[in-house]
Structures are given as structure tokens and as C-alpha cells.
């Protein structure tokens, strides 16, 4: 399993950074990449200090929109409320699911821009740093339920989650995208995803979509390179994860998040 520090287990210093990530990004959860960086001594504070001005900027809001609009998702079959109910998501649960999906869309789009910019900064230390324009603070996001641990799920449900994770490149070594754990309260929905989002899960389609997201994120990040303090001694340890998450894991999940969010019934 990839090392991580979950919010419930975070010591005060890391918990304070997690709270600032939530406040600046407008998302209620701490994504896996940040939880992993927290497990590397000194890295979370260094990385977050570098990208925070970008995360909380007007440029970030515009970049998120452009990447989402450029995704060019394949056509998917609309799903009726009866389909959602059959998958275990009744009318009472749909608002909670919609809130969750909006958070994962925003969080993944934010992270792909910010962390791609950080990766490109490390690759190009002599290039000038951007001076982002601060945006008004986002509304405080309503909390989401804590993520279950994969080992705490019933075996059949854990198998479904692992099977979905295995569809994504970059998820070896026990990496489980947080989205699939967050959807664990709705086992029927998890089981339905390969059918409902079938075109997206075709390996060639998913690779093509991922490449488009990576290219879009790099185009946005070119003008948003963060200023960095002298590099933390742990930066070398974080580079494999930074490359893996910005080139594989996050851009693989963005089309899935956008697609699932897009087929939710209108409120």
C-alpha cells in the first residue's frame, strides 16, 4: 500500500496544512496525493507552500474550466432516476452523491494543474515564477464522510473497488483512487460503473483521454510555475509520486469524475 496520513490520524502540524488545503481549494476532502506527501518528512509543507498561491488564484479557476471543457468525453447513455435507484442511489441520496462528485471534479482539476506546475518547476528551476492573482476565498465546503479503508470493506465490495482501480495505469502497489473508496456506500453504483461508463473504461480510450488531460494541464501550467523555496531534502523521495500522479493517476480519474458527474440527474 502507498504510504499516507489520513486526516483522522494527522498530527497537529499536518492537520493544520490539511485544513488550509481545504480552505484554499474549496474541497472538503484531502486527496491521496496530499496524504502521501504528508508521509514524507518535510514534503507536504514545502509542496503546499509552493502551490498555495496558485490554488487560491483566479488563474486556477479559469484553468479548471478550460481543462474540463477540453476533455471531449465520449457520448454516454443517459441514466434515469430509476437506473440510479436500481444501483442503490435513491432520490434522498442523489444530493449527497452530487455534492461528492462536484468535490472530486474540483479537487482533481485543481490538483492536476497545481502539481503539474510543481513538477514542471522542478524540471525547469531557472524559469521565472508566476505571480497569480488572488481569488476571493471559496465557500467553505460541507464535509464528506471519512473514506473507508479498503481492508475494512466487505470482501466482495473490496474486490469491486480493486477491480475498478486496476483499470487505471499507475495504480499498482496498492494505489486505490479515493473516488472509488468514496463511492463505497453505494456498492450497486460501483458495480454499474463499467457498464454506465463503458466507453471510458476501454484501455485505448482511457489512455487517449489521459493524454489529453496531461497535455491540457501542461499547457496551463507553463504560465503558472510556482516560486519554490530551497528544495526540501525529501523532494527526491516525492518525485516518483509526483510524476506518477500527474502523468497517470489524476489524469486517468478526471474523465471518470467528469463523466459520472455529467450523467447525474438534474436536481
Stretches with model-predicted labels:
Residues 1-267:
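Hydrophobic alpha-helical segments
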Amino acid at each position: 500500500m502507498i504510504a499516507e496520513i489520513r486526516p483522522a490520524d494527522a498530527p497537529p502540524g499536518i492537520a493544520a496544512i490539511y485544513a488550509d488545503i481545504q480552505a484554499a481549494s474549496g474541497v472538503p476532502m484531502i486527496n491521496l496525493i496530499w496524504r502521501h506527501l504528508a508521509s514524507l518528512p518535510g514534503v507536504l509543507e514545502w509542496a503546499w507552500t509552493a502551490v498555495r498561491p496558485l490554488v487560491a488564484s483566479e488563474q486556477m479557476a479559469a484553468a479548471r474550466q478550460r481543462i474540463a471543457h477540453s476533455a471531449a468525453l465520449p457520448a454516454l447513455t443517459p441514466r434515469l432516476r430509476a437506473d440510479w435507484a436500481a444501483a442503490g442511489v435513491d432520490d434522498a441520496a442523489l444530493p449527497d452523491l452530487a455534492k461528492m462528485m462536484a468535490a472530486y471534479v474540483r479537487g482533481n482539476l485543481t490538483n492536476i494543474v497545481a502539481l503539474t506546475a510543481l513538477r514542471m518547476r522542478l524540471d525547469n528551476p531557472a524559469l521565472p515564477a508566476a505571480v497569480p492573482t488572488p481569488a476571493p476565498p471559496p465557500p467553505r465546503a460541507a464535509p464528506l464522510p471519512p473514506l473507508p479503508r479498503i481492508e475494512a470493506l466487505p470482501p466482495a465490495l473490496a474486490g469491486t473497488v480493486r477491480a475498478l482501480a486496476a483499470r487505471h495505469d499507475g495504480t499498482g502497489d496498492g494505489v486505490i483512487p479515493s473516488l472509488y473508496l468514496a463511492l463505497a456506500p453505494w456498492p450497486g453504483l460501483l458495480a454499474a460503473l463499467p457498464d454506465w461508463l463503458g466507453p471510458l473504461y476501454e484501455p485505448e480510450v482511457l489512455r487517449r483521454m489521459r493524454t489529453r488531460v496531461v497535455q491540457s494541464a501542461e499547457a496551463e501550467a507553463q504560465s503558472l510555475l510556482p516560486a519554490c523555496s530551497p528544495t526540501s531534502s525529501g523532494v527526491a523521495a516525492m518525485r516518483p509520486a509526483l510524476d506518477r500522479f500527474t502523468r497517470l493517476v489524476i489524469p486517468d480519474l478526471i474523465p471518470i469524475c467528469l463523466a459520472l458527474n455529467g450523467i447525474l440527474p438534474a436536481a
